[in-house]
Amino acid sequence: MYGSEVFRKLIDSFPKLRVVTGILMSKLYLEGDELSVTARKLPGEGYYDNYNAAMQLDSSEKISLHRKSKLVLGVEKLPFIQYLPWMKNLAINLGGSSGGYGTQKVPSVFFNSQEEKGIAPIICYESIYGEYMNQYALQGASLYAIITNDGWWANTPGYHQHLAYARLRAVEARRDLVRSANTGISAIINKKGEIISHTEWWEQAVLKGNVQHNDELTFYVRYGDYLGRIAAFIAPLLLLLTLVRKLNKTQQRLNLKK
């Protein structure tokens, strides 16, 4: 893409331009490299991994990469594949490679030499995980950018729900969010979760708008789902207390009858 005349003209006109897009990529393992559980054998010798990834292109001609960390079960990820390799044949192929992508443990944040503000490259299904997305903000992301393909939902409530998750993530982190949906609803969302502009479903269009960076960390970003954890701890205690009280009342009634 750096060799594209159109891209070069854009860079010359807008030196701070940052293009974030999706890419399917592969990694070839060299002899002696430690293999991941998703590594595939080449027809001859050697192994490789496939990744669902995002990349950033800018004026520095340096490519920044983020490999999707939260994979869709049954499409991009199969459980216990290292023990049940035959399950690869059961994977649902929705375009591209299927049956076990590679991942990276910690999400990447895109920076560049022209601007210190970080962009969080969020790929599709990753946007439903609130605590996972907090890691982007903790690493300096001041703007969220989601790239997704919602076509496999077809015209069902699924792609609406996926968009709703994006609004929730914007509120949790108080980050403006841009969403590019290849076959869904693209949108610009502010830090209050309000949709500033959007396309229709499966509409080919371009959105133009202003977004603001925010470096502040919200309570949720700092501490995560603490309410859920507290509730999970208290719930069995409340259940036990209820059972004890019920048993005590039953015992009291029996004592009165005597």
Language-model features, listed with the residues they occupy:
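Enzyme catalytic cores with a strong preference for nitrogen-chemistry domains
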Residues: 1-258
